[in-house]
Amino acid sequence: MLVWLAEYLTQYYTGFNVFSYLTLRAILGILTALMMSLYLGPKLIRALQRMQIGQTVRDDGPQSHLSKSGTPTMGGLLILAAIFTSTLLWADLSNKYVWATLFVIGSLGVVGFVDDYRKVIRKDPKGLIAKWKYFWQSVIALVVACALFFTSTQANETSLVVPFFKDVLPQLGLFYIVITYFALVGTSNAVNLTDGLDGLAIVPTILVAAALAIIAYLTGNVNFSNYLHIPYLPLASELVVVCTAIVGAGLGFLWFNTYPAQVFMGDVGSLALGGALGIIAVLVRQELLLIIMGGVFVMEALSVILQVGSYKLRGQRIFRMAPIHHHYELKGWPEPRVIVRFWIISIVLVLAGLATLKIR
């Protein structure tokens, strides 16, 4: 929004041209989202406490979690507000990639909000029934996938980048819609499953978003993209601002979500953030790289799939409890140890993912 204003004012004072620089807007994006989160965080927490919107804890999980009962939830509203405000202020709103990302974040945020509302306000332990949650996630993913596919104007927008291989860019055709669908729905649910311990989901989200910001910048720069043998997508560079807004909002939320948490993000935050990572990876054509960088999310989701599959097929469980972070808690690991070790794994995987841009 302010980009347009700066363009107009530049004719009167050339100094306003500084706001056309992507790096400056990225920095302002992260600072705006961070400061907004830090300022509004205490106010939101008090409001949630006043309305008695607190987390309900299952009694069949780790006993240490019982003390978390009643902790304010739906803090994801703070994250989404900061992301939207920062992006709308500093991004170029004529860019379709920006709007596609905001649509995914907002629509999945609505799905998560309905789920949280039913759980914590209407006291329905099931929340939004799983089949309906999956239905709306699918509708959102398919709408976005089809819209992007049928409005694509260059071959690079629908090619698949294969990590470790130089100039291997197979055209996906209609399979692009399938890939996009699984990237959005899969990542959204994976982040949702990871959000079970204080700060466990938000830090990997911040790390992956920061890495995607770097990739978006490289992809949107013709010189860097040619040097690294990745598709050149001029619209992708504006996603840097969205990614830095996610990083800033995430850091601000972490201030209140770190152990012991003062607030949880709830499904309104986790579903939206997962969808954000998924759609950005799709737009910069790095869906496969997201599997590496988001390895913690993949590990959490796979642990649930394996646990359920094993129990249905063999009548036996593989883990003491799934998602896998609860397995380690039941083995006797203190919660902070589980959290920090998963953070370390995420740092290593994100760095490994970035390294693949050069190792080809």
Curated annotation (Swiss-Prot):
The chain crosses the membrane at residues 18-38, 73-93, 97-117, 135-155, 168-188, 199-219, 236-256, 263-283, 288-308, 339-359. One of its GO terms (molecular function) is phospho-N-acetylmuramoyl-pentapeptide-transferase activity. It comes from Pseudoalteromonas translucida (strain TAC 125). Catalyzes the initial step of the lipid cycle reactions in the biosynthesis of the cell wall peptidoglycan: transfers peptidoglycan precursor phospho-MurNAc-pentapeptide from UDP-MurNAc-pentapeptide onto the lipid carrier undecaprenyl phosphate, yielding undecaprenyl-pyrophosphoryl-MurNAc-pentapeptide, known as lipid I. Pathway: Cell wall biogenesis; peptidoglycan biosynthesis. Its main location: membrane. It is found in: Cell inner membrane. Its EC number is 2.7.8.13. This is Phospho-N-acetylmuramoyl-pentapeptide-transferase.
